[in-house]
Design a protein with these regions (language model features):
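Short, surface-exposed acidic-centric catalytic microdomains
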Residues: 19-63
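Short N-terminal binding/cap micro-motifs at the start of the first secondary-structure element
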Residues: 13-17
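Flexible, gly/pro- and Lys/Arg-enriched active-site loops
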Residues: 43-51, 65-69, 73-127
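Generic serine detector
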Residues: 7, 27, 36, 40, ...
């Protein structure tokens, strides 16, 4: 089984979009577990804020590319467009940040809000 850690963020209609993302992810990955949702300031001048952020964890036999494809499908269903980033709009962003023991997005772990979410996730999964 592969261990999957992902981060989810939104700065647009935040409560609605976060709930939709959680529901969609739970439909795709029934054993998924989530931290609490926390608010953060935007990273970078282009993004509008505030953001809502959450971490999620699940185990699966799927390959990494299939999982990432499902994340992209959820983002597309929710209305994410490539032009939004340049406008500072993040309807939803679902990122695979750790695959088993491999950190895929080390810069994400440096964000201020991540420490709190990582501690929560360790309590949830017992690692």
């Amino acid at each position: 089984m592969h261990k999957v850690l992902l981060s989810i963020g939104t700065n647009t209609d935040t409560c609605f979009n976060m709930k939709r993302a959680i529901d969609n992810l739970h439909s795709c990955f029934p054993n998924i577990q989530f931290t609490s949702i926390i608010e953060s300031a935007p990273c970078g001048a282009i993004f509008k804020g505030p953001f809502l952020n959450i971490l999620a964890y699940f185990e699966t036999n799927m390959v990494k590319e299939e999982i990432q494809g499902r994340f992209k499908s959820i983002e597309k269903i929710m209305g994410r467009q490539s032009s939004h980033k340049a406008e500072g709009i993040v309807i939803i962003d679902i990122d695979l940040i750790q695959w088993n023991n491999e950190v895929l997005k080390p810069e994400d772990f440096k964000r201020d809000y991540m420490n709190e979410l990582i501690v929560q996730m360790q309590d949830i999964v017992g690692n």
